[in-house]
């Protein structure tokens, strides 16, 4: 029972990304608009489990490290909303900004609690142990839904009712990244013994091309980019362990992938949909034939940013001025706080990525941090809002907590 609860707690980090797969596994079909109550119930339930479990652990066990600043981050966000509501009459709980504020409470606050707990009690084993279970559950759901995807007449058709082509591609790429990281890192710490057996090793190798193919079949462009970035980053980090074997493995994986997709028109069309932003050898992140609404939003954002380029329009009032989030983290940051906020954001992100790299170089048992941080880094370039993205907050808070420890360790070396 304890292990099941721990799995549910870790799933809180990615529940927004995988909920459509969980619904499909239990046979629930829902409309994304009409079924919003079901989604809200699921998210609130996982948030409650996560916060309740962390509080219980904190009360019953003595922490190895003392740190409180992440809780002040939560208080600052709450304070900023109510402060802006005093100056901007449209910033209310009933407004679009208010809804995003509530989503911050449901999505971000629980994982901030969890990241702080993991650091304070040295419990990264929670992530290492449960990440591959989540990967297997999601892969199973994706494989079971391949017939539905292949019979779809439009890339907009989803699975489980709510998972569209973007969700399918992103989730498949995320599963691929978790799987490849476990294989190449050769990490055995904190993992269940059954998953270290030769049988599961063969299964994991077999799943890699399947996960990559489903990512392409989904037709999501961001997911395709996540797949490529994950492959490149994981190969770069872990090829030093055994470059020859890694190179041969990579070649075989690519050959298997190319051979399979070459026999199906559906995979070919998915491939074309996934990479149709590749124009003239460059990636166009702004103009997108299939994303007219997002292109219009981004064109609108340039005007809004130009109205207040230095200090922006406010963390929450910026959402009111823009009417929506921009599906791009840098545009959202510029609208909220202008160049000043963007500078602070860059400084923080530089520290996050530098700490992540140092952790991966020195702690093989924490290898699972790599796929967890690549996912939101790619996703937030194309979709979603960073303030309500649980993966973004979890990775940012956790790596910042570890930053001082690993900076000092590198200096001693």
Language-model segments: residues:
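Hydrophobic transmembrane alpha-helices and their immediate junctions
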Residues: 337-377, 396, 403-410
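Alpha-helical transmembrane segments of multi-pass inner-membrane proteins
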Residues: 125-153, 163-238, 374
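Hydrophobic, aromatic-rich transmembrane alpha-helices
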Residues: 3-10, 45-60, 175-193, 339-359
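Flexible juxtamembrane loops connecting transmembrane helices in multi-pass membrane enzymes
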Residues: 249, 261-296, 320-321
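A juxtamembrane structural motif centered on a specific transmembrane helix
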Residues: 1-7, 192, 199-202, 361-366, ...
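N-terminal signal-anchor transmembrane segment
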Residues: 1-59, 76-87, 144-145, 376, ...
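Long extracytoplasmic/lumenal interhelical loops at the membrane interface
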Residues: 152-159, 282-337, 356
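Aromatic-anchored transmembrane helix interface
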Residues: 39-46, 67-82, 91-117, 129-139
């Amino acid at each position: 029972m304890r292990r099941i609860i721990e799995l549910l707690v870790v799933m809180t980090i990615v529940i927004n990304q995988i909920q459509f797969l969980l619904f499909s596994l239990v046979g629930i079909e829902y409309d994304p608009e009409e079924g919003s109550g079901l989604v809200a119930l699921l998210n609130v339930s996982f948030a409650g489990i996560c916060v309740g479990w962390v509080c219980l652990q904190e009360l019953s066990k003595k922490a190895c490290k003392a740190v409180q600043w992440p809780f002040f981050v939560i208080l600052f966000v709450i304070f900023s909303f109510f402060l802006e509501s005093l100056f901007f009459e449209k910033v209310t709980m009933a407004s679009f900004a208010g809804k995003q504020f509530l989503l911050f409470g449901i999505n971000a606050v629980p994982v901030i609690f969890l990241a702080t707990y993991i650091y304070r009690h040295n419990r990264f084993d929670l992530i290492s142990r449960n990440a591959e279970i989540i990967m297997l559950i999601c892969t199973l759901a994706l494989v079971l839904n391949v017939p539905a995807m292949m019979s779809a007449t439009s890339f907009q058709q989803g699975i489980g009712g709510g998972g569209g082509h973007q969700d399918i591609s992103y989730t498949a790429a995320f599963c691929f990244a978790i799987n490849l990281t476990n294989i190449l890192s050769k990490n055995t710490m904190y993992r269940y013994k059954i998953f270290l057996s030769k049988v599961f090793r063969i299964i994991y190798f077999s799943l890699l091309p399947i996960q990559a193919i489903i990512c392409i079949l989904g037709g999501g462009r961001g997911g395709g980019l996540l797949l490529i970035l994950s492959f490149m980053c994981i190969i770069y980090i872990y090829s030093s362990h055994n470059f020859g074997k890694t190179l041969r493995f990579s070649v075989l994986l690519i050959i298997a992938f190319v051979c399979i997709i070459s026999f199906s028109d559906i995979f070919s069309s998915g491939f074309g949909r996934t990479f149709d932003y590749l124009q003239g050898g460059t990636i166009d992140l702004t103009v997108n034939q299939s994303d007219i609404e997002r292109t219009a939003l981004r064109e609108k954002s340039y005007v809004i940013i130009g109205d207040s380029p230095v200090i922006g329009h406010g963390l929450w009032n910026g959402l009111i001025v823009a009417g929506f989030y921009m599906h791009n983290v840098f545009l959202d940051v510029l609208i909220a706080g202008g160049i000043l906020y963007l500078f602070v954001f860059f400084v923080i992100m530089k520290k996050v990525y530098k700490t992540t790299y140092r952790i991966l170089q020195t702690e093989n048992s924490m290898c699972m941090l790599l796929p967890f941080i690549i996912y939101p880094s790619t996703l937030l370039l194309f979709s979603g809002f960073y303030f309500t993205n649980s993966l973004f907050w979890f990775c940012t808070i956790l790596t910042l907590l570890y930053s001082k420890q690993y900076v000092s360790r590198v200096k001693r070396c």
